[in-house]
Every structure is written in structure tokens, then in C-alpha cells.
Amino acid sequence: MDFSLCRNPRGGAVRRNSGPSIRRVHARFPQTTYLRSGEVPSDLLYAAVSSRLSRQTEGLIRGFGFTEAVALNMSNMVGAGPFITIPLVIASMGGPQCMLGWLLGAVLALADGLVWAELAAALPGTGGTYLYLREAFRKTRLGGLLPFLFIWQFIFSGPLEIASGYIGFSQYVSYFWRGMTAGEARLVNVAVGTLLIALLYRGITAIGRITVALWVGVLFTMLWIVASGIAHFHASVAFDFPAHAFTFSAGFAAGLGSAMLIAMYDYMGYYDICYTGGEVRDPARTIPRSIICSVLAVAAIYTLMNLSIIGVVPWRQAMQSKFIASQFIETLYGPKAAAVATALVLWTAFASVFALLLGYSRIPYAAAVGGHFFPVFARLHPTGKFPHVSVLAIGLLAIVASFWSLDAVISALLASRILVQFIAQIFALDQLRRRRPDINRPFRMWLYPVPGAIAFCGWCYIFLTSGWAYIAFGLLTTIGGALVYALWQRLRRPVPAAG
């Protein structure tokens, strides 16, 4: 739609548009009296945007409520991540001062979560970042480039994130399968990925029930670990700081950045419901509430869980452990209880990758519907009404990506995602507020623009301390995507803008 501002002799701004979108809005609101032929009061512009979003989500079923949304986010956030990364976080800073990385990560996640919340409430469609970048920069030169770059980096980072869950799953399976080889671990990854695709190959209402069931197992696992740690907590063990633990230096700054990178990998997922916004009931209220509740709940759980573990298992021993959760329970209750704990960790890991694939499979679908990706991904299952082609494609790519090492997967996925997704979204929110008055914002960021500034500084700090190899990877994937986009624009025939 191409709106142009015109003068209203009765007072107030109106917009002129002779396109079909406003005629459709008038059909929905026949009681509206237009000031002149072709003129529409500005309070109806949001209806036009909503009409475009409705066409994008046409055919999808809004089967997710608040409980399912929180379950989806928290299942994604609390996966295998903390159970396999606690030793890495401790090693990054060399002691219990690593808790600073977790706490700063929680602040960053909450600040960034407010960015997601306002964007998702204003644009409650399917696709998450793709949708926000497309709508925020629709009338600028970046309106085509940024959505394309997001899909481009997602081809790398999305399957990598899911694959990290597969790797963590097989790592804990080796607690039972002692002597597991690398080839056997890959077979486990393939089996888990195949089962996941089979479970997601169904309608969203059934998936919502599965998500809640998995979430219950996640909460039980975390509560057991936290309660056990509190009951056996030893402050002298938890706060056994090494000499010069808080001496600021270049090494301390780099270590803190590394700890925050790993912490944000563990926190990632607070926004997962945004990718399925077209399948959420009352998204303007449900999505912001679910994001904020998920971040606060998981931040509290992670803080208690980390203190619980390092308050029982000395940190010098913990950072060498391959099964920190199992070792923690075994120290307290013996090997049989540790076996149960390991099984629960596997349940938690599976719930996480289930939530990830559910959310990420909607991104290519939304891009295809908007004309920014291959049309085959816009297909819905004839009976289940879910994007089955996208589920299969992302699921298979994640299985392939799971053949790589865990540390490379974590660093590469964050380095490739920070610039085009997290930082670009902060500017997208500012763009919406300043240049898109036609879009209603039912939820507004608290203390704007302070949370956005905190999120921007935090993501830049993590990116710049991730290491030169991963900085180069993030920059090259972005530059490469821009070059591919330029070539694609030269080769393809122009596609009319949606709406």
C-alpha cells in the first residue's frame, strides 16, 4: 500500500489511497464516512495493516493461549543448554564469579524481551523477526534487504541452534551408553531429529497439549535440582573465589563477554512464541505477557540452579564435568538417583528442541507467503493446516548440522544472528515508533528507549568479545547475504508488494 498524507478540512490527519486494501477496509467498516473520495481517517490505517497480516496467517489455527505460550518459551529456554554449558561458563571466568555473566545475561534478556514484546504486540503475525523487519522498513530501501538477510542468516543459525540441542541430548545419553563413539552419537542425533519431525507433523492444537506435557517435565527437573541444592548448600563451596577474581583487566572483560555469550545461548528462546504469532489467541496480550513471565521465571531458576550446583560440587571439579547435573545428583543421592536425573535432563533437552523446531519452521513459511522465499514453503498441510514443507526442511537441516562440535555451533549461531536479528530489531522498533504511525502498538516498552539501549550495548559487547574468527563469520555471512540479495534482485522478475 502506498499512503500519502493529505489535508483534512475537518481537522486531523487523513491518508489518501486508491488501492484495493482500503476498499477492503471500507467493506469491513461500512459505517465510516470518508471525507473525500479516496480518503481514509488515520484511525483506520491499523485495520489495513491488520488486513495484510490476516492474509499472511490465513488458514492457520489460533490454538495457543497464555499457558501454551509460556510453556513453549520456557521449554525452549530450559533445554540441554544449562546442563551442558555450566562447566563452560565456569571455565570462561575461572571461578564462581561466572555468576556475573548469568546475571548480566538476565538483564540483557529482559531488556531485549521488551523489544520483542512491543514488536510482537504491534505485528501479531507469523514469522517473528522477518515480519518485524519487513513492516518496519517497508517504505525504505532496506524494506527488501533486511528481511532477506534475516532469512539468509536463519538458514545458518536456525538449524545450528536446534542441532546444539541434539548434541546435548546425545552427550547425556552417553551417561548410560558408556564408550559411545562419535559415529554412534550422530546416530542418536538422527534418531532424535526424526522423532521430532514426526511429532510436529500434526495440527497446532495437538502440539499445544504436547508442549504443556513436556513443560511439566522441564519444571519438575529444575525444581528437583534447585530444591536438592538448597537443602545441601554450602556457602564456603559456592563462594570459593580465586585470588583477583574481580580484578578488572582485558582478560576479565573477555571472560565476561564469553560467559555472557554462553548465558545468552541458554536464555535464548524467550521470544519463541513470536514465530508462531499467527497461531496465538489474543496475541497483543498473550505474547508480551508470555515473554516477560518466561524471562523472569527462567532467570530465577537459572540463578538458583547454578548456585545449587556449585554449592555442592566444587567449581574446579564442576568445570571439568561432562555430566554436571548427573554428577550433582550422584554426589547427593547416589548412582540410581543420578540415572533418573539424567533421564529427566534428556526429557528437558527433547522439550527444548521440540519448541525450537516448532517456532523456527514457521519462519520460511512466513517469508514465502510474503514473497521473500521459495513459494513451496508457503504450503500448508491439507488437513492439519501447518507448514509441513518448512517442518521437514528445517528438521532435516538441523540433523545435518548436529554432526559438528558443540562449541563451534554455539559461537557460530550467535555471531551470525546478533547483527541481523537482535540489533536490527532494536532499530526496527525505533523505526516503527517514528515513521509508522499507521501501526497500533497495544503494548509499549517500559521506560523507552532505555531497555533498547541496554540491549544494543549488551549485544555489541557479546559480539565484539566473541573472538575474531566468529566476528569475521558474522560479518561475512551478512556481507555475503547482501551480495546474494543484489544478484537475486537482478535476476528475478519484480514481485508486487504485499497489500
Identify the function of each model-found stretch:
Residues R62-N73, V107, K139-F156, N189-V192, ...:
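Select transmembrane alpha-helical segments in multipass membrane proteins
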Residues F373-H381, I426-R444:
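Alpha-helical transmembrane segments
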Residues S170, E184-F239, M268, I291-V295, ...:
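Membrane-interface loop-to-helix entry segments
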Residues R55-L60, M99, M180-V188, A213-T342:
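Helix-loop-helix junctions that connect adjacent transmembrane segments
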Residues L88, G101, L110-G193, A198-Y201, ...:
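Hydrophobic transmembrane alpha-helices that form the core helical bundles
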Residues L131-K139, G143, S174-G179, A245, ...:
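TM-loop-TM module centered on a large, flexible mid-protein loop between adjacent transmembrane helices
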Residues I225-S228, S416-I418, M445-G499:
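A generic transmembrane alpha-helix motif of multi-pass inner-membrane proteins
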Residues R28-P96, L110, L114, K139, ...:
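Membrane-interface "cap" regions at the ends of multi-pass membrane proteins
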